Amino acid sequence: MKIRYSVLSTFIISALYSQDTQANLKHQCLLRVPHFAGEEITADQLNMPIEIEADRAVINQPKEANYSGNVTIKQGNRSIFADNVRIEQQAPQHRKAFLIGRYQYQDNLIQAEGHNALLDLQSKDAEVANTTYQLVGRQGRGEAESGQFTPQTRRLKNASFTACLLNDNAWSIEANEMVQHIKAGYAEMWHARFKIFDVPIFYSPYLQFPLGDQRRSGILTPKLYHSTKDGLIYSQPFYWNIAPNMDATFTSNYYSRRGWQINPEFRYLTALGQGILAGEYLANDRLDTYRPKDMNDRRYLFHWRHNMSFLTDWHLDVDYTNVSDRRYFSDFDSSYGNVTDGYALQHFKLGYYQPQYNLSISGKDFHTFDSFDNVKPYRVLPQIDFNYYQDQFLKDSRFSFFAQIARFENDSKSMPNAWRFHAEPIINIPFVNHYGSLNFETKLYASHYQQQKGENQTAEEVKKQLTRIIPQVKLDFQTVLEADKSLFSGFKQILEPRLQYVYRPYRDQSEIGSKSHESVGLGYDSALLQTDYYSLFNDRRYSGLDRISSANLITAGASTRFFNKKTGEEVFNISVGQTYYLRPSRVDSLAIDSTADRSSSWSVESNWRFQPKWNWHASYQYDTRLHKSSLANMSLQYKPSTENVFQLNYRYVNEDYINQNLSFNRYGQDIKQIGGMIGWNLTDKVAIMASHYRDIALKKAVETQLSLNYNTCCWSANLYVARQLTTTPIGAKDSIRNFYYDNKFGINFELRFGHDYSSGMHKMLSKGILPYVEQYGIN
């Protein structure tokens, strides 16, 4: 598995110009459709007066009137222009207009032209013949042999429809009968023929498609790809608009080398909360080249995301993902996980919240994908947390209290299980004046463990009862200084020094948890935290509560910021810090868990916006123990608009740093990652995304992508080519020098019905195992 150590490689593409593509394309498309002139009337138009103008009129009161020569009839939003019009009135509530010869009809929804028509002036119904029509204010036009118009529907015989503009026959749909539902925003067709450039390519006895941007049930645009690993991939989604507050998508994926996969996704928003319920299921995976023999050929994923607030102060959060096997995300592209994640989270939390306290019960489990150790992380169920806050405890002091009860269980019979009871009172006394702030904090960690030996006979012995009490004292000084003279003219400089002292006595914690399986962490839920400038000022080196290292240390750091005097915007910042250990920090008697040196790594963070459209970020760590660089990364981005971006990235991790922080290291050398990506709208119709990632230490490419989108007013096309690092096939060599790739190719077309003008850039940037990420720490 080399994907987790994948790296970037330089990819530079120059672009000539950019525009707000979506807005420009929409403007160009709508510029060529008719628009309603004047102010739209929303009142009941049946009771509004009818205005008639003509060159000549012969009126036979009260039953008949004949008008000829430039006849114009107006009532509310609708207007009629005709050569000759005869109006008959059999009764006060029965008035009809016969349009003889050529006519034009227009209201706020449709414009039509044809020969001979009958209009009911009382009900707004109309019967037309040999007509061409164009929707008003939106794309959509067609022809019909005959039709019946009502305020709710337009029923057409031997009709056609297309969202393409005039003189563009890229695609059209013809049907024996068509019903356009005006308010609902969709059309139904019977005996429909789909044509491309007037050539019929598809027939359906029934078809439904949208006329606007309202959600409608129906078949969505399919996708077709080819992969050297999976073969031909055909994806056909179906959308079901169940109700205004819930819908679903059913996607059927066909892999020529694997079989059929069914992917349902249900979305809801109810009084019981909002969320997503989804699944992916492949009954029989035929591709055993990438599936171990002991792995079931039934591949599946289940995902549930739910948020709920109820009874004012209660909140429920569920995030649950489960997969059939550890290689699932390596074999299938999924919206609910990525091959680089390393695990699937299974978590729930029910909480009660008040201004001064909160109480919650939760559970957490991790479905890990590593195959290095049969022992997996601990499952926490239940975990009960209590927090209490009081701002005015003694004068200006602040008191807080944290308590937790947690049960840890492991699926491995050789691992111990435990109950943990923890209490943590905290008192903060701040001293603030115009020189700065000094915060004095005292804290007590009080923990009690009830441990149980694993059920296997070979399980290691553990101490059944264990109590650990650790006091802590912390002083944290911060101030903000404004320089009288900045280093650079036109900028205001701010200096933010920070000095922190932390003291905790040493307690041997080697009896907490297992001693022989540190690959799952230390104790039950602790792991060494990655360090950067901001983490230097954390209280602890380890996550969780099972490892609380001794501390007698001083952390010193400073940040300086430069602000543009004219705009007030932050332009540049840099932060430098280091921790000095007055005594080594320990959690047990092992040297590997101790800070032998007197000082930590130097940490540097910097951000620079040297132009409004340019951003630069860098971080660096120098390990004083190793006497070499341990971590470094840099990112440079040019982003002139929301859909135009160019980014270069570099990341370095020292091999010794990896060995120090991981109990296993299959990489065996430094990580050196370099690469770049570009997403650019070349014109209003053409958008491109390209990326290349390379491991310069191993001299191997990790991922190369090229995606090209062509957009018009009524259709779009996407070309996608990729070469991606994939997992090692079963039985193949698996060393740091062996790489295996999956080549992908696809061309997809999408019909547009006049409500989507996007360039597709967001979708293109999210593709790949290393998608686009924007992260710059500047205000």
Curated annotation (Swiss-Prot):
Membrane keyword on record: yes
KW Signal (keyword) present: yes
Gene Ontology, cellular component aspect: cell outer membrane; transporter complex
Signal sequence extent: 1-23
Listed Pfam families: LptD (PF04453), LptD_N (PF03968)
Chief site of localization: membrane
One GO process term, biological-process aspect: Gram-negative-bacterium-type cell outer membrane assembly
Subcellular location: Cell outer membrane
InterPro entries in the cross-refs: LipoPS_assembly_LptD, LptD, LptD_C, OstA-like_N
Domain of life, source organism: Bacteria
Keyword entries, A-Z: Cell outer membrane, Membrane, Signal
Function: Together with LptE, is involved in the assembly of lipopolysaccharide (LPS) at the surface of the outer membrane.
Assembly, per entry: Component of the lipopolysaccharide transport and assembly complex. Interacts with LptE and LptA.
Family: Belongs to the LptD family.
Annotated PANTHER family: LPS-ASSEMBLY PROTEIN (PTHR30189), LPS-ASSEMBLY PROTEIN LPTD (PTHR30189:SF1)
Protein name: LPS-assembly protein LptD
Species: Haemophilus ducreyi (strain 35000HP / ATCC 700724)
